[in-house]
Amino acid sequence: MAKTQSPLQWLATTLIRGYQVFISPFLGANKCRFHPTCSTYAIEAIRLHGFAKGSWLAARRILKCHPLHPGGIDPVPPKKHRCNK
């Protein structure tokens, strides 16, 4: 069963997809030094962690994307479940 997105999650992921389809192709192929790309990471983070935390994770990731950072494989961290015992 698919989890429904909040309106903010939907808006953010739609805007990022728009960037991927309409803007990114004109910036050159494979400019991102990370795998997955920063935009794919942002979509995954927002879908998994929600709008607020996912956006924070995406912003941190984008701030790491510069020539002095080596890049590499950087997956979205898994969601931590709270134990209410």
Swiss-Prot record:
Protein name: Putative membrane protein insertion efficiency factor
Pfam family, one: YidD
Subcellular location: Cell inner membrane
Function according to Swiss-Prot or TrEMBL: Could be involved in insertion of integral membrane proteins into the membrane.
Major localization class: membrane
Keyword terms of this UniProt record: Cell inner membrane, Cell membrane, Membrane
Any one Gene Ontology cellular component term annotated for this protein: plasma membrane
Family: Belongs to the UPF0161 family.
Membrane topology: Peripheral membrane protein
Higher taxonomy: Bacteria, Pseudomonadati, Pseudomonadota, Gammaproteobacteria, Alteromonadales
InterPro entries reported for this sequence: Membr_insert_effic_factor_YidD
